Amino acid sequence: MAAESALQVVEKLQARLAANPDPKKLLKYLKKLSTLPITVDILAETGVGKTVNSLRKHEHVGSFARDLVAQWKKLVPVERNAEPDEQDFEKSNSRKRPRDALQKEEEMEGDYQETWKATGSRSYSPDHRQKKHRKLSELERPHKVSHGHERRDERKRCHRMSPTYSSDPESSDYGHVQSPPSCTSPHQMYVDHYRSLEEDQEPIVSHQKPGKGHSNAFQDRLGASQERHLGEPHGKGVVSQNKEHKSSHKDKRPVDAKSDEKASVVSREKSHKALSKEENRRPPSGDNAREKPPSSGVKKEKDREGSSLKKKCLPPSEAASDNHLKKPKHRDPEKAKLDKSKQGLDSFDTGKGAGDLLPKVKEKGSNNLKTPEGKVKTNLDRKSLGSLPKVEETDMEDEFEQPTMSFESYLSYDQPRKKKKKIVKTSATALGDKGLKKNDSKSTGKNLDSVQKLPKVNKTKSEKPAGADLAKLRKVPDVLPVLPDLPLPAIQANYRPLPSLELISSFQPKRKAFSSPQEEEEAGFTGRRMNSKMQVYSGSKCAYLPKMMTLHQQCIRVLKNNIDSIFEVGGVPYSVLEPVLERCTPDQLYRIEEYNHVLIEETDQLWKVHCHRDFKEERPEEYESWREMYLRLQDAREQRLRVLTKNIQFAHANKPKGRQAKMAFVNSVAKPPRDVRRRQEKFGTGGAAVPEKIKIKPAPYPMGSSHASASSISFNPSPEEPAYDGPSTSSAHLAPVVSSTVSYDPRKPTVKKIAPMMAKTIKAFKNRFSRR
């Protein structure tokens, strides 16, 4: 009756909360709700939680509504929220498992969940609601909360441990077949945990005994299957499973329940370690023979070849990963045994279960063979090369072609120089590689024979080019010409001989002769690079004299470079100075002749050259030399130029002056522009330049009287425009301009003017970076 009356009161208060917006009334109703004995069933039937939760953002009542909702949330048991999480976790694990194992585990899980729901639902049935509601809520809440928390911790640990297996690079390819070992048997871990909990809580909750019996039976089956599984000689997989068992037991079992199982765990560890040590000592072929049951002779041979290839050629890390991949095989027989033990068929052999799993084993073996196939080949090649004798090492190293050109030459599409020796050796290696590939397709016994035969082939083929090279070296010194024994003079201490022209010409690359017009067209096409690099002019490359010059040649060379320094030459004949005088201009030649009158009779031919160059149409008069003709025509030309300059100057002087230059604001203050005036007013820089006024009188021009009078008229202030003495009408802070030069503020640093091209470049850069 009390529950029904509380339900009615809650419904009334809920209706009032929805209808009345007054904050005082709302607070009153919420306080009444907080005093009522509200249960989970009332919250589910009325939905008052949603109504109160809608007021959580209210200005006046929001905080009280939030507190009330938080108080009601504590009433809801954690078990209901934990079960869907557990189901999600089971789904995520079941994706990684094989389908047959998944069905078996779902059956077990369904049986277990039914018993759990049956026991758990009694406390919420309507018969027990009125009688045992208070007692059961007090007893069950701590048990369920702790149980839910511990199950969450289990899942977290599972998820923490699973990435270590999934991150393994070798086992990631087999993700569909293999599941993380730490989460392989969640029922086993859950049942162990649940049994230990129930042993502690037996006097408190009495109706959980059916679940306990079920879990004990299930645990016994699991223990039997594990003991059978221990007898099989799977060393590394069992040891790894045992380590996982150990870590899961350490994390999940409470301290009180550990004492019985510690001894069994330690004994199992010791037995597994002994087994693994014995198997490591045994040869690999025996291990493989035990693991794989006999199906047929051909399959045996193939499997042995694959295993021997793996163990010989793969590095130890890959071998370990292959052993690690065998864990699904151990897990599948275990699940098969669990299923059979349920049905009561104890006479079922383990060998038959392993025989059913043969197709899976074959698939995994083929996958293993596919993935390291490239590594096997490369390792075989390395072994064949390493097994060659040390005497042949230098020849074998030459087989791999070193880069013959620089990186720059590869970029410019230069053709590499071919070497006959290397071509022969590469053919030998190609034959060897073909032999290796053929032998790889056959059995491993033939593989090893081919590896042993390879050195002999390489020996015979490398000896032949070596003998040919020796014969070539013997022939080369016979071709060289024998130099005659000539007595050489003693070498001077300060003498440095220069290279001859013949030697320089031999170093220069000769241009390729084109055999056909098509090649000429291709060479002319700029998009294609020829054998030689593109030549770009970068100054004269010959920085030294091509050959040794005589003393006369050196003197003439110095005189040619310093003609303006030649004055009197004394008794030097014209024949010696002729090459120097040929380089002279008419003015230089005339000056040298003035100092040396003896040369005038000899230089007529030089003057003839100057006359033909400067005065092409003119001819010498009767009995007139070429020198006299040039001087006459040159004087006439200069006279004409002087007359022209006088005429032009006179014409410009008599022209009326349309525009006259006047000095503005000589004795007054110049008005600055508006923007300058505003800045002066703003910063107070107007009257700081010159405090007192100075009247400046313009200096008269030093030209004629007419110009002086005109200038004096122009510069004197007219009576219409009196001199401005007072300050400007616009501003009292304006400074008088002293001279025509612009006055600048000494506080500001002088800015260096940027060149126009540089300014343009800087502007382009700014525009470019401002867009980003």
Curated annotation (Swiss-Prot):
Keywords assigned: Acetylation, Nucleus, Phosphoprotein, Transcription, Transcription regulation
Q: Does the keyword Nucleus apply?
A: yes
Which SMART domains does the entry mention? Answer: TFS2N
Compositional bias (Basic and acidic residues): 79-105, 136-156, 226-235, 253-269, 275-308, 321-343, 372-384, 434-443
The record's region (BC-box) falls at 550-559
**CDD domains registered for this protein in UniProt:** TFIIS_I
Residues in F-box domain copies: 566-610
Query: Where is the segment annotated Activation domain?
Result: 522-681
UniProt-annotated location(s): Nucleus
Q: What is known of its domains?
A: The BC-box, which mediates binding to the elongin BC complex, has the consensus sequence [APST]-L-x(3)-C-x(3)-[AILV].
Q: How does the annotation summarize its subunit structure?
A: Heterotrimer of an A (ELOA, ELOA2 or ELOA3P), ELOB and ELOC subunit. Part of a multisubunit ubiquitin ligase complex consisting of elongin BC complex (ELOB and ELOC), elongin A/ELOA, RBX1 and CUL5. Interacts with ERCC6; the interaction is induced by DNA damaging agents or inhibitors of RNA polymerase II elongation. Interacts (via BC-box) with CUL5.
* Name of the featured protein: Elongin-A
What is the scientific name of the source organism? Homo sapiens (Human)
Q: What is the lineage of its organism?
A: Eukaryota, Metazoa, Chordata, Craniata, Vertebrata
